[in-house]
Amino acid sequence: MSANDFKPETWTSSANEALRVSIVGENAVQFSPLFTYPIYGDSEKIYGYKDLIIHLAFDSVTFKPYVNVKYSAKLGDDNIVDVEKKLLSFLPKDDVIVRDEAKWVDCFAEERKTHNLSDVFEKVSEYSLNGEEFVVYKSSLVDDFARRMHRRVQIFSLLFIEAANYIDETDPSWQIYWLLNKKTKELIGFVTTYKYWHYLGAKSFDEDIDKKFRAKISQFLIFPPYQNKGHGSCLYEAIIQSWLEDKSITEITVEDPNEAFDDLRDRNDIQRLRKLGYDAVFQKHSDLSDEFLESSRKSLKLEERQFNRLVEMLLLLNNSPSFELKVKNRLYIKNYDALDQTDPEKAREALQNSFILVKDDYRRIIESINKSQG
C-alpha cells in the first residue's frame, strides 16, 4: 500500500465521470451523463473504489442494455455502495446482460431480426434530414413491446433531464413518441406525453359528447449522438402538428421545460405562426382586440403564457410601437404586489430592467431563427 491509498480522494470517484454510456451501432459512441444523482445520490460521488469505470451500453436499434463495472481495488467495508446493484435497480429486470459482452451482442443481433416498430406502433409522420429519412411513431404503454422499449430507454430521462422521474406505465393516459432512422432502424430519441381531461365549463360539458383534453409534453430527449442536427425541431413539430389535427385536444402544454427546450419551443412556435400569416397581421395591426387574440390562442391550442410570449416576439420582430407597453403591462400585473410596496421611482427602474431582460432574450431567440435560416 502506498501513502495515497490512505487518502479519501483515492477511493472517491465522480459518478458522472465514472459512468460511461454508449450507444452501439456500426460504431460505438460513448458519452457521459449530465446527472447521476437519482442513482448515486445528491453528491454524485461514489466512495470505496479505485479507478472505477461503469460501462452502460445499449444497442442502437433495440436498446438492449449491457452493464460492466470495472475497478482496480475496492475497500472491504460493508457500507460501501454496490455500484452495479444500484445501477441495475434502475434498469429492466431480467433484460440486462451483465459483464458477458459476447452474450449481449448475440442477444441484440437475434432480436434485431424481428424488431420492427412499424409493425406495432402508429406512424405519425416522416421527414428528410441531411439525405436520410426519419420516421415518427407513437404508442401507448398498453402494448408489451412498447413497455419493453420504454423500460430500456427510460434511464436516459434520469441521466439527461434534470428532476426527471420514471412515469407510471400503468396509467393509460401516457403516450410515447418514437423517432427512428427509416433505413437503419436506429432509435434517435423519444418523448413521453400525457393527456388530461380539459373542463371547458358547464355549458360545454353538457353539450359535448366527446371529451376534450390538454396534451402535455413531459420528457423530450434526442440521444446525445444525434443532438444538434435538427432532429429536436422535426420531432417537436411532428408532435405538435398531430395534436393540432386532433379535435379532442384543446390545449398544448409542456411540463417544466429547461432553457434549451424553451428555446426550441419558441423558435418552432414563432416560425409556425409566421407561416400561418400572423407575422403579416401584426405588421398591419399592432393593436389587436382581446377577442381576436383569445380566438387565435384557442385555434393554435397554445397555453396563455406561451401565446403571450409569442405575441410579444412578433411585435418586436415588426418593430411595433406597442411592444414595450404590452411587455411592461404584463410584467407590472405579474409583479404587482412587489412593485406596489416599492418606492415609485425604484419600481419604474425595476420594471425597466425587467423589460430590457425580456427584450434581449427575445432578440436572442429571433437572431437564432434568422441564423438557422440564413
Curated annotation (Swiss-Prot):
The keyword Transferase applies. Residues 135-303 form the N-acetyltransferase domain. GO terms for cellular component: chromosome, telomeric region; cytoplasm; histone acetyltransferase complex; nucleus. The record marks 174 as: Interaction with histone H4 N-terminus. It comes from the Eukaryota. Acetyl-CoA binds at residues 220-222, 227-233, 258, 267. Belongs to the HAT1 family. This is Histone acetyltransferase type B catalytic subunit. It comes from Saccharomyces cerevisiae (strain ATCC 204508 / S288c) (Baker's yeast). The lineage of its organism: Eukaryota, Fungi, Dikarya, Ascomycota, Saccharomycotina.
